[in-house]
Amino acid sequence: SAQITEVAHTNHVVNPSYMALSKNGKYLYAVNENTDDKTKGMISAFAFNNKTGQMDFLNTQPTNGDAPCYVAIDSLGKNVAEANYNGANFSIYKTDTSGKLWPATQIIGHNGTSANKKIQTQSHVHSTVFSPDQKYLFVCDLGNDTLYQYPFKINNLLPVDVAGAIKYKVPAGYGPRHITFSPDQKYAYLLNELDAQLMVYRWQNDSLTYLQTLVSTAVEDTANADKGASAIRVSPDGKFVYT
């Protein structure tokens, strides 16, 4: 009948705007996107049974920034990275053997503004994405029109090398939101929220090389429409990109 049936729910989150499942399918992490107080952003950890759908609450940690909006976990399940949109920062957490989160081991702040005077009045960290080889953490900052490539050492207590960051600027007012990689790990796709632009890069030798920018024709055809883009996915065969 194609009906959806609830199999489990939890009350241990508030406004869970983004979540990530560990590669082994055993643990689920969700951010609590609180925006009323800079001290109230939280991230919650759950043990997850992928056969029954049951979620068992493990613990919660503060995100150390307002409006957490993204979370990712490395392929080994050792580090969780989350982005704080209004907090202008991102936090890194270690996990223990049960999947629980330690308090944040790194809190890394950004600054800067850009052309959109309504939205880009400060840094807005929007996503934290691990490179396919797990050697880098890519951080999209919508507020200052910058994509950051941070060297990342999975086993280090402080895995993010802040001083070693590479910065890729996008055109003023674009607002980079999410980045993802092709299944063959040869290309990266950067979705820009504010101007609905999709940028394509070659990923080779630990570096991004710009290739092209694609525009939503729906936005182009409506001169006065509000532009916006929110998520991006690549098909398993790598032939299609969806935004």
Please name every model-derived segment:
Residues 3-11, 55-62, 102-112, 159-168, ...:
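Beta-propeller fold detector
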